[in-house]
Design a protein with these regions (language model features):
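Cys-dependent protein tyrosine phosphatase-like superfamily
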Residues: 1-51, 63-134
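Ser/Thr-glycine-rich phosphate-binding loops at phosphate-binding pockets of nucleotides
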Residues: 56, 60-61
């Protein structure tokens, strides 16, 4: 369909599932690199509606969504609230995912406000580091 342009822009880092929920914000920070900035710039400059997603729709998609919302001027609370919506939306899928992978804990993979708050606290330093190395 010529009305659509498909771009495959994978997040190339941060693919290790943390063992405890306290490590989740750091796993999100690991995703923030030049490739993620390219993804954000591509979505930002699309000039029309865009769909983006990952396998589960909460980690990589959550990080991209948070940074896009931040770029759009959304409040910190709006970003956190948006992220936490995934907990209810993905409840069944996450329970099935954990049931198939006994090494994982539901408390680690469930989106929490604390996770996004910690990520938002730490991401400015990471973004500065990326821009200085560009």
């Amino acid at each position: 369909d010529p009305r659509f342009q498909y771009l495959h822009l994978p997040v190339t880092t941060g693919d290790i599932v943390p063992h405890c929920f306290e490590d989740v914000p750091n796993s999100y920070l690991d995703m923030v690199d030049g490739q993620l900035m390219h993804i954000l710039d591509t979505l930002w400059s699309a000039g029309r509606n865009a769909i983006y997603f990952c396998n589960a729709g909460k980690d990589r998609t959550g990080v991209v969504s948070a940074l896009l919302l931040q770029r759009m001027g959304a409040s910190r609370q709006e970003i956190v609230d948006n992220y936490v919506l995934s907990a209810d939306n993905l409840k069944t899928m996450l329970a099935d995912f954990v049931a198939k992978r006994p090494e994982l804990k539901l408390e680690v993979v469930t989106p929490r406000a604390w996770t996004m708050e910690q990520f938002l606290d730490r991401v400015p330093d990471k973004l500065r580091s990326i821009s200085q190395n560009a």
